[in-house]
């Protein structure tokens, strides 16, 4: 992302296009392609991937670092899609949730950590969540079935149990 004080407008717009197209537009287009199929099939399940920046561990504020403005905006957009779609699609038996994950061992985080000269010591890398842990949690969420939770941003954080929280009650929207 960009530094709103130091980076040029050109860099900011270029970074915006890249991150919003990847993080938000990708989720939007994939969801819009899948939703008609899910509705016509009698229901289904959408799991969006957001970030712990919008659903932080207890005791922490939302948002990433000082240079995370565009990344955070794109992930907040995913929150908006998750919330709106879950309300609209609930009557069609389509559940929509998001995982708001902390650092997960992946090619992306390894690349970013190296690019930005972040600590890659064994202790740090070992602390990252493993993909199989998230896959297990994903299956648990899916297996809740048609009556399972919808519209939830589920925080999954380092140094916390990797588990589903209690299901939240769906609140009515102020807007139709």
PLM regions and their residue ranges:
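Catalytic loop of short-chain dehydrogenase/reductase
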Residues: 7-15, 45-77, 82-83, 87-91, ...
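A short, exposed helix-loop element centered on a Lys and neighboring polar residues
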Residues: 31-32, 83
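Conserved Rossmann-fold SDR core element
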Residues: 79, 89-105, 148-154
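C-terminal helical subdomain
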Residues: 98, 118-172
């Amino acid at each position: 992302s960009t530094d709103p004080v130091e980076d040029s407008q050109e860099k900011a717009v270029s970074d915006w296009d890249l991150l919003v197209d990847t993080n938000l537009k990708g989720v939007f287009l994939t969801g819009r392609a899948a939703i008609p199929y899910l509705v016509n099939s009698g229901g289904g399940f959408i799991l969006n991937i957001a970030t712990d920046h919008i659903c932080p561990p207890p005791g922490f504020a939302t948002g990433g670092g000082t240079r995370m403005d565009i990344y955070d905006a794109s992930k907040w957009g995913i929150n908006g899609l998750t919330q709106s779609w879950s309300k609209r699609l609930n009557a069609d038996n389509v559940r929509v949730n998001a995982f708001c994950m902390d650092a997960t061992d992946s090619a992306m985080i390894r690349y970013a950590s190296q690019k930005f000269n972040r600590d890659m010591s064994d202790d740090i890398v070992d602390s990252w969540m493993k993909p199989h842990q998230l896959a297990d949690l994903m299956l648990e969420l899916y297996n809740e079935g048609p009556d399972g939770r919808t519209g939830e941003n589920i925080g999954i954080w380092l140094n916390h149990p990797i588990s589903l929280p209690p299901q939240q009650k769906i609140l009515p929207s102020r807007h139709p």
